[in-house]
């Protein structure tokens, strides 16, 4: 029953604003094969002011006809999220439908697993699988801390839970972070409770930098001990 978006009619506005504010890339979720053509047409009509990454949501990871349709276009890269209620192997196998159709520009996104074992978070945080995905595939790995945590809660240390799990994923080697920000989360039409305020962006980026430095130091140490 959540907000479903404005559909294709909003695409010209989105691309106009992306160009105006010099946004480099937009992740756009597609749920039907016709939406791919809608996006490509609107992007071309707007003069290609921004990059677009098509997104396959968790509930469509095993929508094989959609995967094949998205895979047949090779202009836009694809972000595919871990599937809803299926194994990691099954989710990774879904990426083969994209690659087999011709699109090998794929990013795999860990976004938490739906189980009450993750309570009080929205989903069970699965960022320990970052190195596992890299071991099993050649794919860059994205983490989605917003959908994993699902709230703006913070610990006794004053650090937001979203930032804690983001650091976990970055230290584990994540290549990309997908996180929700909103100027007024309380008025957001979707996912407001998990969105961070825009004035927290600098804090978030600084915290990410600390986590990245920790990752780099750990990999340097590993090279030292592994010869």
Task: Report residues per predicted region.
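C-terminal helical cap(s) of enzyme catalytic domains, especially alpha/beta-barrels
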Residues: 184-218
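Flexible glycine/acidic-rich beta-alpha junction loops that bind and position SAM and/or redox cofactors
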Residues: 116-118, 151-153, 182-192, 221-227
């Amino acid at each position: 029953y959540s907000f479903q978006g404005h559909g294709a009619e909003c695409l010209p506005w989105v691309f106009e604003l992306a160009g105006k504010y010099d946004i480099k890339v937009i992740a756009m979720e597609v749920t039907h094969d016709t939406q791919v053509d809608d996006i490509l047409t609107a992007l071309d009509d707007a003069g290609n002011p921004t990059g677009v990454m098509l997104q396959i949501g968790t509930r469509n990871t095993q929508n094989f006809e959609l995967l094949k349709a998205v895979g047949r276009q090779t202009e836009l890269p694809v972000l595919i999220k871990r599937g809803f209620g299926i194994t990691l192997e099954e989710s990774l196998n879904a990426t083969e439908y994209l690659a087999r159709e011709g699109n090998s520009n794929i990013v795999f996104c860990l976004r938490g697993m739906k189980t009450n074992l993750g309570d009080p978070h929205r989903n069970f945080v699965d960022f320990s699988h970052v190195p596992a995905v890299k071991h099993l595939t050649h794919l860059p790995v994205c983490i989605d801390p917003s959908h994993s945590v699902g709230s703006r809660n913070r610990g006794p240390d004053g650090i937001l839970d979203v930032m804690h799990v983001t650091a976990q994923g970055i230290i584990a080697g994540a290549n990309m972070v997908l996180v929700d920000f909103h100027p007024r989360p309380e008025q957001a039409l979707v996912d407001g409770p998990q969105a961070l305020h825009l004035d927290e962006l600098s804090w978030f980026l600084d915290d990410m930098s600390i986590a990245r430095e920790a990752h780099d130091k750990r990999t340097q140490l590993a090279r030292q001990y592994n010869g």
